[in-house]
Amino acid sequence: MAKAAAIGIDLGTTYSCVGVFQHGKVEIIANDQGNRTTPSYVAFTDTERLIGDAAKNQVALNPQNTVFDAKRLIGRKFGDPVVQSDMKHWPFQVINDGDKPKVQVSYKGETKAFYPEEISSMVLTKMKEIAEADLGYPVTNAVITVPAYFNDSQRQATKDAGVIAGLNVLRIINEPTRTIAYALDRTGKGERNVLIFDLGGGTFDVSILTIDDGIFEVKATAGDTTWVEDFDNRLVNHFVEEFKRKHKKDISQNKRAVRRLRTACERAKRTLSSSTQASLEIDSLFEGIDFYTSITRARFEELCSDLFRSTLEPVEKALRDAKLDKAQIHDLVLVGGSTRIPKVQKLLQDFFNGRDLNKSINPDEAVAYGAAVQAAILMGDKSENVQDLLLLDVAPLSLGLETPGGVMTALIKRNSTIPTKQTQIFTTYSDNQPGVLIQVYEGERAMTKDNNLLGRFELSGIPPAPGVPQIEVTFEIDANGILNVTATDKSTGKANKITITNDKGRLSKEEIERMVQEAEKYKAEDEVQRERVSAKNALESYALNMKSAVEDEGLKGKISEADKKKVLDKCQEVISWLDANTLAEKDEFEHKRKELEQVCNPIISGLYQGGGGPGPGGFGAQGPKGGSGSGPTIEEVD
């Protein structure tokens, strides 16, 4: 068997995507619904857990227990202003557990609380299963992408989510790495400056790369860490006000109504990318009132005009950081679903004086595409398409330590190419100081109190000579963007170090181990549920097929009334039993099926012995393919 491939996963805020590099090219893998992107949604019901399309399809029926946007929680504190702001829009409950946010849901009749890492791990597990179903063998190695502006704890938390999902995370890479996809499709030689404009479901960043003969150097990244795709929110608020004007009723506190409205708004927003007008038709939205309305593209652009304009600020910042003029940018690449909005494209085009935008990459798939290529490189793929590619990524934030007066002294500057290592000599501040406290920060502000504390450690046993000791401090970032800090007293050789992997926001080894075991348990429960539903569907399908077989007009005179009655009575008995026992176990359904077969098989096989008919049990008995098989497969939202 060929060596198992590593996969590239774009773990998105609203949608996720998985790709694999094989036979010299990237394949984006479709899920069991035939979709190449999968909603980053997890739903909990009284009977099961649903992930992806199945979870999103039932969101209007079960808004409190359907979790999305976990990426906006991951690696953040509960008190973070972004978390507090987002909580106002979410129908599910977020609780505080020692300043770590947890999502509280009702699952199988019990109240459960999950860390964002656990929710993200469930989405990653789904992406892993999608890849395995396509490739036909177990997959463990993966590259996972994060936004360029993600800080250390957000990167670590994403890596933890991968571990909980049973993945060996080869590397956490910045999403702009996806331009590898772009470069693979380019045959032109010579140095080119490329600006990637990435506007997704909950993240927004801009990167500038220089590509020269297979070497990618990230010159600058800029992003809006507080960005949330407010386009949907603006539409929702607009229609809530319209409903209030028309019907004198406020629907904003009704979670189901708001969820149905949001789904319709999301659809309208997509329609407005290709049409100048979109209609919304939602039956019985609130208190039996049907809501039929429409919106023009011009009105949508007016509602979001400030948001559209604000997307140019990170573009200007990235150009300043890269020390480039906009005329020096050769290519503009659009990534992320929201770049399909015509107004966004026009603003960007006007800013770059009418320059053509590169739309050759599918914006939804570009990230997974780039991640799949990176996974192949890390696994030692020797295809000529990838062997000459080298990606030089950058540190998204400055890293340094606190010096007297609370001053931030940066050793690694923002946008430094990684991996990197920087060393600087410090001395003791006061006479006869026996030890130094090394406090490590990330951020761009002059004072450490305004930056993010990553960790601290002490170097003790320093000889008590005033201002003489020489302390050598080394900051080293590896290719995953993970930081090691070492301090050495040059006179004694004493050293101490810290790996910034376990700041207060991070899960402990024990917690991760527990979550891995729980993930296995949930997966096993999901499998039991799938088998149960499959057995139920098989029984129902068999009973209905037997019923229609003996009622077939073509069999008149071939089957005695007594036999016909026997089959119909037994089928009806089974159908009634099914209606009353929808939550029965797999073996109960199988037992009922055997009972039914014992009655039907002798009669049916007698009928078909002469001709090649369906034969005993030959009708259906398969149940629906794919999916989790239970609950509503579609839910009408409009």
UniProtKB/Swiss-Prot annotation:
- Induction details: By heat shock.
Where do the segments described as Substrate-binding domain (SBD) lie? 392-506
Q: Which residues carry this modification: N6,N6,N6-trimethyllysine?
A: K558
One term of GO molecular function: ATP binding
Compartments reported by the entry? Cytoplasm; Nucleus; Cytoplasm, Cytoskeleton, Microtubule organizing center, Centrosome
Q: Name the predominant localization.
A: cytoplasm
In residue numbers, the region (Nucleotide-binding domain (NBD)) covers 2-384
SUPFAM superfamilies reported for this sequence: Actin-like ATPase domain, Heat shock protein 70kD (HSP70), C-terminal subdomain, Heat shock protein 70kD (HSP70), peptide-binding domain
Instruction: Show the ranges annotated as biased composition (Gly residues).
Output: 608-630
Question: Positions modified as N-acetylalanine?
Answer: A2
Q: Which residues carry this modification: Phosphoserine?
A: S628, S630
Residues modified as N6-acetyllysine: K77, K108, K244, K346
Residues reported in the UniProt entry to bind ATP: 12-15, 71, 201-203, 266-273, 337-340
Spell out which residues are annotated as carrying N6,N6-dimethyllysine. K558
User: Region Disordered: start and end of each range?
Assistant: 606-638
Q: Which GO terms describe its biological process?
A: positive regulation of microtubule nucleation; protein refolding; regulation of mitotic spindle assembly
Keyword Ubl conjugation in annotation: no
Give Gene Ontology CC terms. Answer: centrosome; cytoplasm; nucleus; ribonucleoprotein complex
What modifications does the entry list under PTM / processing? In response to cellular stress, acetylated at Lys-77 by NA110 and then gradually deacetylated by HDAC4 at later stages. Acetylation enhances its chaperone activity and also determines whether it will function as a chaperone for protein refolding or degradation by controlling its binding to co-chaperones HOPX and STUB1. The acetylated form and the non-acetylated form bind to HOPX and STUB1 respectively. Acetylation also protects cells against various types of cellular stress.
User: What job does the chain carry out?
Assistant: Molecular chaperone implicated in a wide variety of cellular processes, including protection of the proteome from stress, folding and transport of newly synthesized polypeptides, activation of proteolysis of misfolded proteins and the formation and dissociation of protein complexes. Plays a pivotal role in the protein quality control system, ensuring the correct folding of proteins, the re-folding of misfolded proteins and controlling the targeting of proteins for subsequent degradation. This is achieved through cycles of ATP binding, ATP hydrolysis and ADP release, mediated by co-chaperones.
> Family per UniProt?
Belongs to the heat shock protein 70 family.
Share the domain note from the entry: The N-terminal nucleotide binding domain (NBD) (also known as the ATPase domain) is responsible for binding and hydrolyzing ATP. The C-terminal substrate-binding domain (SBD) (also known as peptide-binding domain) binds to the client/substrate proteins. The two domains are allosterically coupled so that, when ATP is bound to the NBD, the SBD binds relatively weakly to clients. When ADP is bound in the NBD, a conformational change enhances the affinity of the SBD for client proteins.
Q: Could you tell me what this protein is called?
A: Heat shock 70 kDa protein 1
Protein species of origin: Chlorocebus aethiops (Green monkey)
